[in-house]
């Protein structure tokens, strides 16, 4: 079976990860002790993708949990599904990274990384045919960003041909936790561009907006945000965990979504949006799902797809529905909004149908888009980075851990290159190339 190894790092990564496992366990009928109590064969058919079956018939998540301080992990362990994880797979230090990327990547994190890699190796050896890794982390702090990217590059070295998927929470302008977020995020993106295959971009600001506007929650807590993230993650991974009419795996996802290797940062959306307590009481139709899913307000990252163009997109529909209707709806969206899709990639929207809906819903859909408008987000972080870096503010925290200013300059220009690559493809039209070729012809003649 094609297994996926899940790794979560830092405070944010561990909280999102814990939530993700709660959702996945519920969908597969697995209780908090790891025993199966579900009612459908389909729940077990591809359970090996995320779980290892222990000798006593219990299912243990293929998960590695790491952090540089014990706090968050203790709360995961004492949480609702804390007892389901393998105890040896909790790897933590005592010092903390203090929101410092350099501590996570070079000093504190580097001391802990070997014990994390040992656990990763052990889990990978337990797999029949490992298809890839998924990493949950945030880019604003120290551990998830610094140590997370260190781990990704080490795994890259050791398993060069396996797919690396990340769920990365970007810092957002309104919800700031630390003043050095732009530094940490830029240094991380520099790593992710090189070492990750696919990055699902999540963003606290967009999540707040959804909670506030759509779900009418006046004071959204991190629990509410994580509920949304876990719904999205469950949707992105559902066709890997359940049989369906149009299946896909991490590699197929990448092949359909990434036209150029560096442009692998995806916007994700989810429909129908529900708050934690209230699942919707009316059944949705495929057209309604489609309409909601493409809506800019449903995107969980703070970039507006209407400001750019889609290079590629992919939709995962869940529930009992006709594939024909799904295809018609997707074609309909493309025809009506053709200006928002680049015309030089025909048929650039793919859809997948998975038969099992999320808990409490009859139908749902998840959207994954590779849109040039995501440059807004990089641009925003880059501006904040430059403002501080120009004055060398807070830099001593990083140089004190042995970093060089040169690294900052490199990361900054890499981020700006990424933005201009997105811009270049946004402006490109199908006819550009033809003219250039004709000119060459004439020149030769």
Curated annotation (Swiss-Prot):
<comment type="similarity">
    <text>Belongs to the tubulin family.</text>
</comment>
<dbReference type="GO" id="GO:0000278">
    <property type="term" value="P:mitotic cell cycle"/>
</dbReference>
<dbReference type="GO" id="GO:0000226">
    <property type="term" value="P:microtubule cytoskeleton organization"/>
</dbReference>
<dbReference type="InterPro" id="IPR003008">
    <property type="entry name" value="Tubulin_FtsZ_GTPase"/>
</dbReference>
<dbReference type="GO" id="GO:0003924">
    <property type="term" value="F:GTPase activity"/>
</dbReference>
<feature type="binding site">
    <location>
        <position position="11"/>
    </location>
    <ligand>
        <name>GTP</name>
    </ligand>
</feature>
<feature type="compositionally biased region" description="Acidic residues">
    <location>
        <begin position="429"/>
        <end position="445"/>
    </location>
</feature>
<keyword id="KW-0206">Cytoskeleton</keyword>
<keyword id="KW-0493">Microtubule</keyword>
<keyword id="KW-0963">Cytoplasm</keyword>
<dbReference type="InterPro" id="IPR008280">
    <property type="entry name" value="Tub_FtsZ_C"/>
</dbReference>
<comment type="function">
    <text>Tubulin is the major constituent of microtubules, a cylinder consisting of laterally associated linear protofilaments composed of alpha- and beta-tubulin heterodimers. Microtubules grow by the addition of GTP-tubulin dimers to the microtubule end, where a stabilizing cap forms. Below the cap, tubulin dimers are in GDP-bound state, owing to GTPase activity of alpha-tubulin.</text>
</comment>
<dbReference type="GO" id="GO:0046872">
    <property type="term" value="F:metal ion binding"/>
</dbReference>
<dbReference type="InterPro" id="IPR002453">
    <property type="entry name" value="Beta_tubulin"/>
</dbReference>
<dbReference type="InterPro" id="IPR036525">
    <property type="entry name" value="Tubulin/FtsZ_GTPase_sf"/>
</dbReference>
<feature type="binding site">
    <location>
        <position position="144"/>
    </location>
    <ligand>
        <name>GTP</name>
    </ligand>
</feature>
<dbReference type="GO" id="GO:0005874">
    <property type="term" value="C:microtubule"/>
</dbReference>
<dbReference type="Pfam" id="PF00091">
    <property type="entry name" value="Tubulin"/>
</dbReference>
<keyword id="KW-0479">Metal-binding</keyword>
<protein>
    <recommendedName>
        <fullName>Tubulin beta-9 chain</fullName>
    </recommendedName>
</protein>
<keyword id="KW-0460">Magnesium</keyword>
<dbReference type="GO" id="GO:0005200">
    <property type="term" value="F:structural constituent of cytoskeleton"/>
</dbReference>
<dbReference type="InterPro" id="IPR017975">
    <property type="entry name" value="Tubulin_CS"/>
</dbReference>
<dbReference type="GO" id="GO:0005525">
    <property type="term" value="F:GTP binding"/>
</dbReference>
<comment type="subunit">
    <text>Dimer of alpha and beta chains. A typical microtubule is a hollow water-filled tube with an outer diameter of 25 nm and an inner diameter of 15 nM. Alpha-beta heterodimers associate head-to-tail to form protofilaments running lengthwise along the microtubule wall with the beta-tubulin subunit facing the microtubule plus end conferring a structural polarity. Microtubules usually have 13 protofilaments but different protofilament numbers can be found in some organisms and specialized cells.</text>
</comment>
<dbReference type="InterPro" id="IPR013838">
    <property type="entry name" value="Beta-tubulin_BS"/>
</dbReference>
<dbReference type="InterPro" id="IPR000217">
    <property type="entry name" value="Tubulin"/>
</dbReference>
<feature type="binding site">
    <location>
        <position position="204"/>
    </location>
    <ligand>
        <name>GTP</name>
    </ligand>
</feature>
<feature type="binding site">
    <location>
        <position position="226"/>
    </location>
    <ligand>
        <name>GTP</name>
    </ligand>
</feature>
<feature type="binding site">
    <location>
        <position position="138"/>
    </location>
    <ligand>
        <name>GTP</name>
    </ligand>
</feature>
<dbReference type="Pfam" id="PF03953">
    <property type="entry name" value="Tubulin_C"/>
</dbReference>
<keyword id="KW-0547">Nucleotide-binding</keyword>
<feature type="binding site">
    <location>
        <position position="142"/>
    </location>
    <ligand>
        <name>GTP</name>
    </ligand>
</feature>
<feature type="binding site">
    <location>
        <position position="143"/>
    </location>
    <ligand>
        <name>GTP</name>
    </ligand>
</feature>
<feature type="region of interest" description="Disordered">
    <location>
        <begin position="423"/>
        <end position="445"/>
    </location>
</feature>
<dbReference type="InterPro" id="IPR037103">
    <property type="entry name" value="Tubulin/FtsZ-like_C"/>
</dbReference>
<dbReference type="InterPro" id="IPR018316">
    <property type="entry name" value="Tubulin/FtsZ_2-layer-sand-dom"/>
</dbReference>
<dbReference type="GO" id="GO:0005737">
    <property type="term" value="C:cytoplasm"/>
</dbReference>
<keyword id="KW-0342">GTP-binding</keyword>
<feature type="binding site">
    <location>
        <position position="69"/>
    </location>
    <ligand>
        <name>GTP</name>
    </ligand>
</feature>
<feature type="binding site">
    <location>
        <position position="69"/>
    </location>
    <ligand>
        <name>Mg(2+)</name>
    </ligand>
</feature>
<dbReference type="InterPro" id="IPR023123">
    <property type="entry name" value="Tubulin_C"/>
</dbReference>
